[in-house]
Amino acid sequence: MSKNRMKKFVSILLALTMTVLCFVPAAAAEPKDKVTPILIIAGFGEYVLVDGDGNQVWGPSQDAIVETAKNAIAPLGAFLKGDYETFCTGIVEIANNLFEPVSCNPDGTAKHPDVTVIDQYTEPVSQYGLDEVTRGDVFDKDIVDACCDEVGADNVYVYGLTWHKSMQELAADINTYVQKIKADKHVDKVSIAGHSMGGAVLASYLGLYGCDDVSNITMLNSAFTGLDMVGCLFKGEIAVGIDKLIPFINQSMNSDTLGKVLDTLKLLQLAVPKLEGFLETELPDGSGRTYKDRIYTECLVSGFGYTPSLWAFVPDEYYDDAKAVMKAYMEKNQQQSGVSASVIAANWATFERKIDEIHDIQANISSILQRAKASGTSVCIFSNYNLYIAPFTPTADYTSDGVIETNRTSGGATCARLKMTLGDDYVQARDVGHNCLSEDGIIDASTCMLPENTWFIKNYGHSMFDYRKNGCDLYVRAMTAKTQPTVDTWAEYPQFLVYNAGTHYVAPLTAKFGDVDLDGSITPVDSRLALRYVNGMEELSPTAKYVADANRSGDISTFDAE
């Protein structure tokens, strides 16, 4: 072949090669570790809700709270005088005015469809800026910041709950988000994390749409199995735990000042028995019904009972009894409004279909998550414990994250009652191949739906995402994991952890100060590692930094290495 022909041949070959390469899918040129976008579903009340004119209707504005407090003075005065009828009429009116903008009709539809979150961010955080997306009246959580640092603000999305919409509507919104993210980012899957009620929405989405579009499922103190407290309330079980009320107030206020005042004056000891007596007092109409029945019928049913999404908070073992109790109150509520029996029946049929569909998902969530894992989707569950919950039901002594009971957020852990242990003779309930008992004797994780993929953090609040140190690190690792993590995946983050409010660190429950290499014992090796870190010769993990600060000064120095 002549040189000219060879040149022509090579030129044609190169041209053909370039032509073929033009048609090779773009994915072939993408990096193997392409970032998977993250969608965070916020919890109940994390976004302010506004009406069609932009007026804040939930959470209550400062002005609304002040007005409510002023309006409550007269009814409270009547209560102290023993005038229960005036007191009940007053508080029912106050509560109904407060909840009316976010209430639902007896068939489960919103009374005011124009009420929605103050802002819904349909684009990634980068389009608005972190300060905008985490401002006070929306999702003001450091977890967004942590995710942005890990995968870039262009790959993080946040969904705010218009929580009085049905779970079916909320799940449909999530599906719309997921499809948009996939199209915009040219990805096959999205990592989804659900916080609090957002976890119940995530569960509903998985039950209705499956997990084919989901790379990672992360439950963050999630209500995906309900709340014992709500189950009790929907069954009509109210009980104020005086001994738990002051600790709960102190915990909520992050101070014991108010608790000390209340305890010294014995105000709660005087007020609570009187309140319980009021609830059980029969109405003066001779019906045999009590003031508790009246409050449920005229207030709680319209404020919460008709809201189908809140029924996702009723755990499976409470559900049938709760339906029977609330149905009776709902019927009475509508009868008092002059609604005919046929319309009442039609309303219930429509409402029941909505709540039953979502309840069936909750009742089968273990199987749903197991199937997700089997299909290659990573599933991680995070549950906090050792905090008081609102003490207004018989389950007030359940350990919790301050809002939801730990046995619920963990998907079934066996938990000791608050400030107690399971006992020295307690034996792990199930053999799952490794120890599932917390070193403090409070938790048995073997009874969880996914004991291999469930972590517990002691003393960490329901909505705490403390990013000052490593308080978001484990969560972000789970959201971005390329394969299924287990409680053995990260040595610095075993199954049982503890949050230190003074240092802002999350560390193993068994962590020993000075044990820098985390091998369970303190040796000269630990001193050497601390010195190397001080001299800039060694990098330490967040947990190692936590234990290296042996003298708790807030900084690692040569004194810690001594």
Regions found by a protein language model. Give the residues of each.
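N-terminal secretory signal peptides that target proteins for export/translocation
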Residues: 1-5
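Sec-dependent N-terminal signal peptides of Gram-positive bacterial secreted proteins and lipoproteins
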Residues: 6-27
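Cellulosome-associated attachment modules in secreted, modular CAZymes
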Residues: 23-29, 509-562
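N-terminal non-catalytic accessory region
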Residues: 30-193, 197-252, 388, 395-509
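Aromatic-acidic/polar surface patches that form glycan- and anion
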Residues: 136, 163, 167-170, 372-375, ...
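Short amphipathic alpha-helical segments that mediate assembly, nucleic-acid/protein binding
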Residues: 140, 258, 291-292, 322-323, ...
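Alpha/beta-hydrolase fold catalytic core
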Residues: 154-161, 165-168, 294-398, 420, ...
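Serine-dependent carboxylesterase/thioesterase catalytic core
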Residues: 168, 172-346
